[in-house]
Amino acid sequence: MPTWLKVTIILIALFFALLVATIYMGYRAAMRLGEDAKTTGDEATAFAQGKESPACVDEAVARAVKCNKGDAFCLMRAQMFMMECLDHAKMPPDFCASVPAHNGFQIRNRWAADECARRGHPDDARCNQMLQTLQLHCSSKR
């Protein structure tokens, strides 16, 4: 068998091995994310019982700032927690009044940055992300 054919067969085998490994890892990540979503949703629903919406925001921000920078799964869990908690907590009538709509890029970013600084997390992208999630929630309630 010629050398070029051996090299080609080895490269094809390596390609398929990498393909199988990628599919397997993607499947495992999807299963983990599904389990995390259910667990986080259950935690948020339990947390929301007897509480008002601001408590949900405080807890979600606290969870987010504990995430390692760059840990997208942790931030997604914090966002899921906030959305689920806000859906089950009692919302005060004026809760969203001071939250700007999620349509003006500069306005929403400035508000989130100012609010994070007020909460003791200046220049923290994780806090900003949580408050932008709050803006989405409030925009959908208007």
Language-model features, listed with the residues they occupy:
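Immediate post-signal-peptide N-terminus of mature secreted/exported proteins
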Residues: I23-A72
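Non-cytosolic head/periplasmic domains of membrane-anchored proteins
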Residues: P54-D58, A62-R142
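Alpha-helical protein-protein interaction elements
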Residues: V7, F16-L19, T39, E59, ...
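N-terminal positive-inside, membrane-proximal cytosolic segments immediately preceding the first
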Residues: M1-I9, L33-E35
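Hydrophobic membrane-insertion alpha-helices, especially the h-region
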Residues: K6-R28
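Generic N-terminal initiation segments characterized by hydrophobic and/or small/turn-forming residues
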Residues: P2, R28-A30, M83, L131
